[in-house]
Amino acid sequence: MGAMQQGLDGKLAWVTGGGTGIGRATAAWLGRAGATVAISGRRVEELEKTAAELRAQGLRIEVAPADVADAASVAAAHATISGRHGPVSVLVCAAGTNVPNRSWSKLTPEGFAKVIQINLVGVANAVHAVLPGMRAAGGGSICIVSSLAGWTYKDFPGVAYSSSKTALDPLVQSLNDEEGRHGVRVCHFCPGEVATPILRTRPVPPSDEEIARMLRPEDVADAIGYVVSAPSHVCLAEVVIAPTWNRFYIGGEDLKRRA
């Protein structure tokens, strides 16, 4: 941890999508920084497995199952963890999804709605849950895992995914506008390609060689950790992190050729 960073001892962190990928790696980072970490997701077995593995490393991990698309489910999970540990100091929204059929010619209304509900509405549900406690505590850190697809348009992530991630930018800006006066700072965190399970939803699965070029979840977790452990007067409002070999720069032409 750099000289600029502050520890998370005694704080409660909540990671949605915490069972796998970026969420899991971030939960581990936060736990090593001293936080008690609650992880949420829909797949309870996956959450319990992750929690057991991280507890074996000496980390304080709570399992709080929740479907981020369901506001009542999110509120119930938040009530459980805050009832045990007090207000959430750090929220990382890492739950996300995509669908294989991504172009207008193949995408269904149901597929579009599913992606929007999880990637956008799910973030709003989690933020709604934690804001009152953060205001009362005099501050907090929220990191919303978006995507490079929400920072610059390319067609290969698909219209539903790109729309859901692009909408997170004004969501974050509005939060910093309204909640910064209460000590709450929010980051629109935009990673490029990361080797996570969401790759399985691609119409053209990446090769092992392509996956080897991507960011690792731990790379992203390190950057998220830097964001949420910055001094309280510092707001990193947007972070873009990408692999050196960046498919967004080549326009996904390799995917189009193979599709």
Where are these regions (language model features)?
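Residue(s) in the substrate-gating loop at a strand-loop-helix junction
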Residues: S147
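The beta1-alpha1 cofactor-binding region of Rossmann-like NAD(H)/NADP(H)-dependent oxidoreductases
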Residues: P65-A77, P109
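Substrate-binding pocket helix/loop in short-chain dehydrogenase/reductase
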Residues: R102-W104, T108-A113
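C-terminal helical subdomain
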Residues: R181-V184, H188-F189, D208-I250, D254
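Active-site helix of classical SDR
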Residues: V127, S164
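Active-site-adjacent segment of SDR/Rossmann-fold oxidoreductases
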Residues: T152, S174-V184
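Conserved glycine-rich cofactor-binding loop
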Residues: L12, G19-G21
